[in-house]
């Protein structure tokens, strides 16, 4: 591990937890493990924003539907060609809400006062995530719409072509922050060649991270294929991600590293 990465990691985690498996480079780190455990190892008030796409656990109403693999729930691809499945998506709504509130509470303590939080979600879990956010002590401030522009048509029904970003802040959020006025609706199609089953468009995340103060440090507790970490770095931020699924820990780390090496002036 490069010395500068070790120093960066020491800035955010307690000394006794430094052996956490991790990967990264200049200004970015991905930690391998369970968010509930790792997030409690962070020092207080070290992050300027929390931006993440947690498991929705919403792919069906009945237990048999919820207990399907994430590829079966969220993709029409042949499983032989689909990205790996990911962990943590089989909770029922009540246990999911409790779990969300628990890690959000610990994450808030690791964020600076006024830090924004942005959480992706779909319509099924929208009410629950707003409860969890507030139970954890965050101030709920609104919702951003991601319009995917296309979706499967359903006769006699509205298309489900949007997902949402519930957002808030860790206490008061001064208007004097050096952040401009940001859109409330983003229109991007789903990525065509996805590394992750539920991967979000890179440009969408590049737009979202701008809610953070310039040059700040962003936390993504469910970094999957590393999209938020990559977007943060491309926009001039530092980033720390957490990923529990073995396959995505490696895929995400490799993706971020290779993408940054291909960028002029950002080679590791």
What are these regions (language model features)?
Residues 1-7, 11, 15-249:
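Core catalytic lobe of class I
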């Amino acid at each position: 591990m490069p010395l500068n990465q070790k120093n960066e990691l020491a800035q955010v985690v307690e000394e006794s937890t430094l052996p956490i498996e991790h990967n990264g480079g200049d200004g970015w780190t991905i930690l391998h493990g369970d968010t509930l455990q790792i997030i409690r190892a962070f020092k207080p008030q070290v992050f300027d924003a929390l931006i993440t796409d947690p498991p929705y656990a919403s792919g069906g109403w009945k237990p048999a539907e919820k207990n399907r693999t994430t590829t079966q729930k969220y993709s029409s691809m042949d499983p032989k060609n689909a990205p790996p499945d990911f962990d943590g998506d089989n909770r029922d709504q009540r246990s999911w809400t409790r779990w969300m509130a628990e890690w959000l509470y610990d994450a808030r303590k690791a964020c600076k006062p006024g830090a924004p939080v942005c959480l992706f979600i779909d319509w099924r879990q929208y009410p629950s995530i707003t409860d969890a956010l507030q139970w954890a002590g965050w101030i709920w401030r609104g919702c951003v719409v991601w319009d995917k522009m296309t979706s499967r048509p359903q006769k006699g029904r509205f298309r489900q072509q949007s997902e949402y970003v519930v957002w808030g802040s860790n206490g008061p959020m001064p208007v004097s922050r050096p952040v401009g006025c940001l859109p409330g609706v983003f229109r991007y199609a789903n990525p065509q060649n996805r590394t992750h089953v539920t991967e979000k468009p890179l440009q969408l995340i590049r737009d979202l991270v701008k809610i953070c103060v310039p040059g700040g440090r962003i936390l993504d507790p469910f970094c999957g294929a590393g999209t938020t970490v990559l977007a943060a770095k491309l926009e001039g931020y530092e980033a720390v991600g957490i990923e529990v699924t073995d396959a995505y820990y490696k895929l995400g780390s490799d993706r971020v590293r290779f993408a940054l090496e291909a960028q002029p002036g950002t080679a590791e």
